[in-house]
UniProtKB/Swiss-Prot annotation:
This is Translation initiation factor IF-2. Residues 492-494 are annotated as: G5. One of the essential components for the initiation of protein synthesis. Protects formylmethionyl-tRNA from spontaneous hydrolysis and promotes its binding to the 30S ribosomal subunits. Also involved in the hydrolysis of GTP during the formation of the 70S ribosomal complex. One of its GO terms (cellular component) is cytosol. It comes from Paracoccus denitrificans (strain Pd 1222). Disulfide bonds: none annotated. Residues 355-362 are annotated as: G1. Residues 163-179 have a biased composition (Low complexity). The keyword Lipid biosynthesis does not apply. Belongs to the TRAFAC class translation factor GTPase superfamily. Classic translation factor GTPase family. IF-2 subfamily. Residues 402-405 are annotated as: G3. Residues 456-459 are annotated as: G4.
């Protein structure tokens, strides 16, 4: 024996190896060597104990032997350190034990789940096997019944074939016998020999019982002679058909033959919907929906849109219910909940000061606020809506809105009347009721708000308050002094007379109104003014009407949305929130809103963006619908009318939205049937290069109202020759535009009659034609003037003179009482007794 007999060869330890055979399709196999490594579990408790045992004497030795102890450590300190060390070791042991227990629990849980999964899979396999066996048994019985019926039919046939058998008949009979024998063998199933059972093992009997009665001709692929002669082996059901039949039988056994009841759905139907989306919402096939539409005469594809009415017909045809929804439903997220009475709290009144221009509205408000706003207004007139809060002597807080009085600011006054609680109508005692006073009265009546009349400038010598009261009667405003219900107060903004009485009247009116609001809800307010600030971006002056607007709130206002970045009150101070009746400047918008838009606070940024997008699309659709409503005839008629109309294009940029609107409205009123002003674009903010490009393309001037052009815009204007005009007073702007538009008017031609001449004789002159010998009876006859030939006071000819002679000399003019000779240009039909009317044309420039 060798040295290695009975010894294991050397190798890597720590693992066990084995072989696993992987089977693939087409009989391919692959051997894989699998090595399993075992992990050595180290129990911390035992290790620690052993280690501790080895060093058990050290701490005591250290603590007992002062020479081995670290310097400066007392016995008590050493004992504490040792106790802490022992506690740490104990914790480590506990944690290790807990980890082992957790791992064991997880392993048990995994084993339990594996067993459950295996049991479930086994049950599923057994159930499927039972269903398969049942289906095969049913199929076998059906075949046997069919065979029995066929045999009975053959036996019942009348035996009329009793005639001498021919060789062909004998061959057919033998084939039939063989065929019957083959079928019997197939029905009974293939026999297995004992050797087959021994070879395949003990499970052969079970397989024979399962396969009993199965037709194996499809599997063996063999074809007997009798089958070939009989034709049975020709066209048979495919293997896929057999599988489908088995699947149907399995579903039938499981109860799948019951037809699923159709589910009726509520289909949300917008104004327009894509065909594929409609099919998806109905849970129907898209081709079925397209077929339904084609039956209606609509040739559509899956990606085409259809209107709501057509989609509703399709939904009804498929048996579902249509639920109409509108795109406007996105605005339902805006809180419109009615406030409970117990949540309402008193709020400050909102007072709008209105009246004619230069009647002292801003001066009166300055006197109340003890400020001086008039000095900062261009031209001494208000051109913006100002919002202020004033604290009265009794402690009450009042919110004032100062509106412009100029005729161009009608829309501003209308907005001021819509958001106010009380209107203070300022009328100058020395000027009485004026056009904008009447307009302010109409705005207050339309808004159904109470009115207080403040008769201003009573300190002037020409003041006549009684005339003001009388003039107001003409407009159905009856003051208390005239036995009416409207309060009237005589005040002087200059001397301060009557201001306390005015504030008392306002407080009394506010007390009667019982103004309340709920501060504990999402804010809602109105945009008083909006502008585009160079450093701060879009800024909106908002008057909070309900709720509390806080910094960080997400809001939607008109077609814009944003997040409150900062709130600035009327004193220029930053605040964190603004309650009801508080005017603030809001920063954080994504664009400049329109003055008069309503601000609503929403929950999320997505909601705000969705509402703003819907409003933008709705505005586009409205403009498109307005353009589409014009017929071709109307369009041609308008184009023909515009051919004779001269246009003055302008580009308007203003500091605030309200001023821009007022300028546009004022310019639209300029013009007549021959000339008009066309505003190409108006906006808020500084003049930019894009404005210059637009103006250059249309050969229009750029009007800047309280704004200036930036450096690139100025350079572009100089290069392209675009005129930029700056204004700070709306009077001057309107007057200049009106003068420029007047220059487009064609000059008016006026005729001045300068004389008459009577024809005394007619002479025929060769080379010249007929020449009239005339006597100037009135005025003077000039060679350059126009003439008309009158016969019996009827104009026969109008033209010019070819020649004017005095005796034989050509002269420029002939005075009254003198004789002369006249010949007409291209006209000879003159007679004795006709009268010649002499006139001159003069062009006069027209004004709008």
């Amino acid at each position: 024996m060798s040295d290695t007999d009975g010894k294991k060869p050397l190798g890597l330890g720590g693992g066990r190896s084995g072989h696993v055979k992987q089977s693939f399709s087409h009989g391919r196999t692959h051997n894989v060597v699998v090595e399993t490594k075992r992990k050595r579990v180290v129990v911390p408790g035992k290790t620690g104990a052993a280690a501790g045992g080895g060093r058990s004497g050290s701490p005591s030795a250290v603590s007992g032997d002062p020479s081995k102890r670290p310097a400066g450590i007392s016995d008590a300190e050493m004992e504490r350190r040792m106790a802490a060390l022992r506690a740490a070791k104990a914790r480590e042991v506990e944690e290790a034990a807990q980890r082992i227990a957790d791992e064991k629990a997880r392993e048990e849980e995994r084993e339990r789940r594996r067993l459950e999964l295996e049991a479930k899979e086994r049950e599923e396999r057994e159930r499927e096997e039972a269903l398969r066996l049942k289906a095969e048994e049913d199929e076998r019985r059906a075949r046997e019944a069919e065979l029995r019926e066929k045999k009975k039919a053959e036996i019942a046939k009348p035996k009329t074939e009793a005639r001498p058998a021919t060789p062909a008949d004998r061959a057919a009979a033998e084939a039939a016998a063989v065929r019957a024998e083959t079928k019997g063998v197939s029905a009974a199933g293939p026999r297995k020999t004992d050797r087959d059972r021994d070879t395949r093992g003990g499970g052969g009997d079970d397989r024979d019982s399962r396969n009993k009665g199965r037709d194996d001709s499809r599997r063996t692929g063999k074809l007997s002679l009798s089958q070939a002669l009989d034709g049975e082996g020709g066209r048979q059901r495919s293997l896929a058909a057999m599988k489908r039949k088995q699947e149907k039988a399995r579903q039938k056994a499981m109860g799948g033959n019951q037809r699923a009841e159709k589910q009726v759905r509520d289909v949300q139907l917008p104004e327009t919907i894509v065909v594929s989306e409609l099919a998806n919402r109905m849970a129907e096939r898209t081709p079925d929906v397209i077929k339904s539409l084609m039956r209606m005469g609509m040739m559509v594809t899956a990606n085409q849109s259809i209107d709501a009415d057509t989609a509703e017909l399709v939904i009804d045809e498929f048996g579902h219910h249509a639920v109409r929804v509108s795109d406007a439903d996105v605005e339902q997220v805006i809180d419109q909940v009615e406030d409970k009475p117990e949540d309402l709290q008193p709020r400050a009144p909102i007072i709008t000061i209105m009246g004619h221009v230069d009647h002292g509205k801003t001066s009166l408000l300055d006197a109340i606020r003890h400020a001086n706003v008039v000095a900062g207004e261009a031209g001494g007139i208000t051109q913006h809506i100002g919002a202020y809060q004033v604290k009265a002597s009794n402690g009450a807080v009042l919110t004032f809105l100062d509106t412009p009085g100029h005729a161009a600011f009608t829309s501003m006054r209308a907005r001021g009347a819509q958001v106010t609680d009380i209107v203070v109508l300022v009328v100058a005692a020395d000027d009485a009721v004026m056009p904008q006073t009447v307009e302010a009265i109409n705005h207050a009546k339309a808004a159904k708000v109470p009115m207080i009349v403040a008769i201003n400038k009573i300190d002037k010598p020409a003041a006549n308050p009684q005339k003001v009261r009388t003039d107001l009667l003409l407009h159905e405003v009856v003051v208390e002094a005239m036995s009416g219900e409207v309060q009237d107060v005589e005040v002087s903004a200059k001397t301060g007379q009557g201001l306390d009485t005015l504030l008392e009247a306002i407080a009394l009116q506010a007390e009667i109104l019982e103004l309340k609001a709920n501060p504990d809800r999402p804010a809602q307010g109105a945009v008083i003014e909006a502008q585009l600030d160079v450093g701060r971006g879009p800024v909106a002056t908002v008057l909070v009407q309900n709720g509390t607007l806080k910094r960080g709130d997400i809001f939607v206002v008109g077609e814009q949305w944003g997040k409150v970045r900062a709130l600035i009150n009327d004193k220029g101070e930053r605040v964190d929130e603004a309650g009801p009746s508080v005017p603030v400047e809001v920063l954080g918008l994504n664009g400049t809103p329109e003055a008069g838009d309503v601000l609503n606070v929403v929950s999320t940024e997505a909601q705000a963006r969705e509402i703003a997008d819907y409003r933008i699309q709705a505005a586009k659709d409205k403009r498109a619908a307005a353009g589409a409503a014009i017929t071709l005839d109307q369009m041609l008629a308008k184009a023909k009318a515009d051919e004779n109309v001269a246009e003055l294009p302008v580009v308007i940029k203003a500091d605030v939205q309200g001023s821009a609107e007022a300028i546009v409205q004022a310019l639209e009123k300029i013009g007549n049937d021959e000339v008009r002003v066309r505003v190409l674009h108006y906006g808020v903010g500084a003049i930019t290069e894009s404005d210059i490009g637009l103006a250059e393309a249309s050969q229009a001037p750029v009007i800047g109202f309280n704004v200036r052009a930036n450096a690139p815009a100025r350079n572009a204007a100089n290069q392209k020759g675009v005129e930029i005009r700056y204004y700070s007073i709306i009077y001057d702007l309107v007057d200049d535009i009106k003068a420029a538009a007047s220059g487009l008017l064609s000059a008016e031609v006026r005729e001045n009659f300068i004389g008459y001449a009577e024809i005394k004789e007619v002479f025929r002159v060769s080379g010249v034609g007929n020449v009239a010998g005339c006597l100037v009876t009135e005025g003077v006859a000039r060679r350059s003037a126009g003439v008309r030939l009158l016969r019996d006071n009827v104009v026969i000819h109008e033209g010019t003179l070819k020649t004017l002679k005095r005796f034989k000399d050509e002269v420029k003019e002939v005075q009254s009482g003198q004789e002369c000779g006249m010949a007409f240009e291209n006209y000879d039909d003159i007679r004795k007794g006709d009268v010649i009317e002499i006139f001159e044309r003069e062009e006069v420039q027209r004004q709008l």
